[in-house]
Amino acid sequence: MAPNLRKHHPLLKMVNNSLIDLPTPSNISAWWNFGSLLGICLMTQILTGLLLAMHYTADTSLAFTSVAHTCRNVQFGWLIRNLHANGASLFFICIYLHIGRGFYYGSYLYKETWNTGVILLLTLMATAFVGYVLPWGQMSFWGATVITNLFSAIPYIGQTLVEWAWGGFSVDNPTLTRFFALHFLLPFIIAGLTLIHLTFLHETGSNNPLGISSNCDKIPFHPYFSTKDILGFIILLLPLMTLAMFAPNFLGDPENFTPANPLVTPPHIKPEWYFLFAYAILRSIPNKLGGVLALAASVLVLFLAPFLHMSKQRTMTFRPLSQLLFWTLVANLFILTWIGSQPVEHPFIITGQLASLTYFTILLILFPITGMLENKLLKL
């Protein structure tokens, strides 16, 4: 009998082991769909981004008009641009839900998979930031100025670093050119890191809602989870298309309809919604260096998750105290997101500071203590 090509061909064998014959726990829920949804987001962003790059000009005098030209004169240019801009929002929704799932179900105990995932998040954040600068609107320009300026808080080398990043003494043409180059490059780095992420995941196999070994009860990925993933794709693409068609500017900033002007500062400089939680943490500390450190810590704290796990149980499925803490953290992140969009005025300043303090307290102190307390309760 001829050998099965799917199982023996050097390339098809890899696809087979990852997407067809992959042994998968039979009880993984819809929360496990977000990995594949992120893959679809990445592919959509690369495709729409490539089409946009064909019509874009990375020059301060032409960038804004080239984006307007794409929307007005290119066949379906408006749709490609709207899909790309709103696709970024959906990408972040998916990645935040994916991280939340990993946190809830203790997936961070697969350390390599978790760490590559956090690196992926950081790379995605960098990509989104440099991409937001490209249309060269007011918020693009001032967002770039404010965020890159944060590097000047680094002692001794800060100012040199900022001028090196700008390619001059302010955000100008060299900055835009290099940001375009980076925005083109980074998604492909993300794609490469994704393969590493999956390689590490397939070393251990997927976790499951019970957090126990599922080796005795696994089913092939195809047709069960391939079908489930396709349903996920449809459910993901529906809101994306709806947003892109009916409310394309709903998540954007109206300030970005004005071309960049270094002489006029917008009344409220704020990033896109998906960075607001970190922006609120940055603003909650009155010291520049302290704010930058807190901003970095807000994401880098994820690297500590495996070391802060004190519970004898992997997931939070049967840990009501940790569940309460988890949902408090989620609510806290919503509060931070809201605070980040507000002006720096009385009620918002103290609220942001309390929310920032709560964020780090829950992650670094309360989670480990609760884990140990639940271990004690198990013995009663």
Curated annotation (Swiss-Prot):
Entry's Gene Ontology BP terms: mitochondrial electron transport, ubiquinol to cytochrome c
Annotated residues for binding of a ubiquinone: 202
InterPro entries with a match to the protein in the record: Cyt_b/b6_C, Cyt_b/b6_C_sf, Cyt_b/b6_N, Cytb/b6-like_sf, Cytochrome_b, Cytochrome_b_C_euk/bac, Cytochrome_b_N_euk/bac, Di-haem_cyt_TM
Pfam families given in the database record: Cytochrom_B_C, Cytochrome_B
Chief localization: mitochondrion
Record's subcellular location: Mitochondrion inner membrane
Membrane-spanning intervals of the chain: 34-54, 78-99, 114-134, 179-199, 227-247, 289-309, 321-341, 348-368
An example Gene Ontology molecular-function term: metal ion binding
Cofactor: how bound: Binds 2 heme b groups non-covalently.
Keywords of this entry: Electron transport, Heme, Iron, Membrane, Metal-binding, Mitochondrion, Mitochondrion inner membrane, Respiratory chain, Transmembrane, Transmembrane helix, Transport, Ubiquinone
Amino-acid positions noted as binding heme b b566 in the UniProt annotation, renumbered to this chain: 98, 197
Record flagged with keyword Heme: yes
Bilayer topology term: Multi-pass membrane protein
Matching SUPFAM superfamilies: a domain/subunit of cytochrome bc1 complex (Ubiquinol-cytochrome c reductase), Transmembrane di-heme cytochromes
Family recorded in the similarity comment: Belongs to the cytochrome b family.
Role this protein plays: Component of the ubiquinol-cytochrome c reductase complex (complex III or cytochrome b-c1 complex) that is part of the mitochondrial respiratory chain. The b-c1 complex mediates electron transfer from ubiquinol to cytochrome c. Contributes to the generation of a proton gradient across the mitochondrial membrane that is then used for ATP synthesis.
Other remarks on this protein: Heme 1 (or BL or b562) is low-potential and absorbs at about 562 nm, and heme 2 (or BH or b566) is high-potential and absorbs at about 566 nm.
Protein name (record): Cytochrome b
